[in-house]
Each structure stands twice: as structure tokens, then as C-alpha cells.
């Protein structure tokens, strides 16, 4: 198991949930957390604990976003008009690494970030190497011609595990995707229940 995979599964174990719906997740085989004390019965969480866990799960899902960056995303979501939890999810799903993941160009959000950071992706014909780059509706995301060989190796895994949501149009033959619209929370295909309203409560304390 690679270091990246180990980190990903560590998040699953910490949350006690298979947050990406991966068949190989260790929580599919056990219902306790990591470490020698993981088998102890879990105590009931306080309101703060529930809110913290919701925040950790959401930011973990998007590749364990650093706290400073996640807080900045939340701050922007709260400044925008409309429902803050919906705004938060919309901003997270507008990230370039999230779109590359949703489009099935790579098997995990961790791989998506690395793929973008290594310069394999273009947005509207321009190479972008920042995973947190925010895409707008209508943006065209494509894998560089010289990088398409890297993607096809993972094709069987990608296509077997999840569908492309309807707010993204993807052509897997050309390795091109269009970000159609910013999704609502109900549109996002999370394998587990996400509770962004609890994230709002956490930061509003």
C-alpha cells in the first residue's frame, strides 16, 4: 500500500466510515478506529464533537484540505448570498481537483490533486497546476495529450466504481470534461452522509 493510499485509509479509519465508498477500505472489515485503542466502545460525542467530526469528514473527503484553506473556503461561503452549507459544497465541488476526480480521469481525489499539480491538466486550453483552482460553469477541463497514456492505465478502476454526476459532462475517449453548473448538495454523489450545516455550526461557535 502506498503512502498516499495509507493516508486515505487512515482518514476512513479515523472517521469510522468508508467516506469514498472504496471496496478496499479497512472499515469494510471492522467498525472501530485506528490504533491499539480502536476497539474500545465509542463514547457519545458532545455537540462540539459532532460538529468537529462533520468538518473533519468533509475536508477529509476532498483530500484532507488544510485547516487554513478550508476555513477560507468556509469564510467565502458565508459571505455569499444564499444558504451557507449549499455555498460551501458548491465551492468545494468547483475545485479543479474535485472536477478531475468527478470526471473519472483518476480514481481518487488524492490522485486528482497530484495529477493537477504535476501539470497534466488544462482549463480552457491553458495548463493549470493548482488543485484548488476554482472552475466556473462552462469551463472545459482536458487532460494534456502527452498525459493521456497515464490516465488510460486506470480506466477500468475508474469506470467500475462511480458514475459521472450530471453537473459535469465528460468524454472519456478525448479525456475532456465540461463543468456544466455548480451543484446543489443534493446533486453531489457522496457515498456517505455529509452534514455541511454542522460545519457552519462549528465555525459559528
From Swiss-Prot:
PANTHER family: 30S 40S RIBOSOMAL PROTEIN (PTHR11831), SMALL RIBOSOMAL SUBUNIT PROTEIN US4M (PTHR11831:SF4). The keyword rRNA-binding applies. Keywords: Ribonucleoprotein, Ribosomal protein, RNA-binding, rRNA-binding. The keyword Cell inner membrane does not apply. One of the primary rRNA binding proteins, it binds directly to 16S rRNA where it nucleates assembly of the body of the 30S subunit. GO terms for biological process: ribosomal small subunit biogenesis; translation. Part of the 30S ribosomal subunit. Contacts protein S5. The interaction surface between S4 and S5 is involved in control of translational fidelity. Residues 1-46 are annotated as: Disordered. Gene3D superfamilies: Ribosomal Protein S4 Delta 41, Chain A, domain 1 (1.10.1050.10), RNA-binding S4 domain (3.10.290.10). Residues 94-157 form the S4 RNA-binding domain. Belongs to the universal ribosomal protein uS4 family. This is Small ribosomal subunit protein uS4. GO terms for cellular component: small ribosomal subunit. One of its GO terms (molecular function) is structural constituent of ribosome. It comes from Sinorhizobium medicae (strain WSM419). HAMAP family: Ribosomal_uS4_B. Residues 1-16 have a biased composition (Basic and acidic residues).
Amino acid at each position: 500500500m502506498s503512502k498516499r493510499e495509507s493516508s486515505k485509509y487512515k482518514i476512513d479509519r479515523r472517521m469510522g466510515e468508508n467516506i469514498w465508498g472504496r471496496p478496499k477500505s479497512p472499515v469494510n472489515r471492522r467498525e472501530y478506529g485506528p490504533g491499539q485503542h480502536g476497539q474500545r466502545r465509542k463514547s457519545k460525542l458532545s455537540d462540539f464533537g459532532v460538529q468537529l467530526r462533520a468538518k473533519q469528514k468533509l475536508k477529509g473527503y476532498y483530500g484532507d484540505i488544510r485547516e487554513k484553506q478550508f476555513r477560507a473556503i468556509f469564510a467565502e461561503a458565508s459571505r455569499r448570498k444564499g444558504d451557507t452549507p449549499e455555498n460551501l459544497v458548491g465551492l468545494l465541488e468547483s475545485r479543479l481537483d474535485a472536477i478531475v476526480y468527478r470526471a473519472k480521469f483518476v480514481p481518487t481525489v488524492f490522485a486528482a490533486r497530484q495529477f493537477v499539480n504535476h501539470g497534466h491538466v488544462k482549463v480552457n486550453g491553458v495548463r493549470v497546476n493548482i488543485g484548488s483552482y476554482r472552475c466556473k460553469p462552462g469551463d472545459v477541463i482536458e487532460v494534456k495529450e502527452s498525459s493521456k497514456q497515464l490516465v488510460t492505465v486506470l480506466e477500468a478502476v475508474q469506470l467500475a466504481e462511480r458514475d459521472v454526476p450530471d453537473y459535469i459532462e465528460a468524454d472519456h475517449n478525448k479525456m475532456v470534461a465540461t463543468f456544466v453548473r455548480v451543484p446543489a448538495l443534493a446533486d453531489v454523489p457522496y457515498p456517505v452522509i455529509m452534514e455541511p450545516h454542522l460545519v457552519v455550526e462549528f465555525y459559528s461557535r
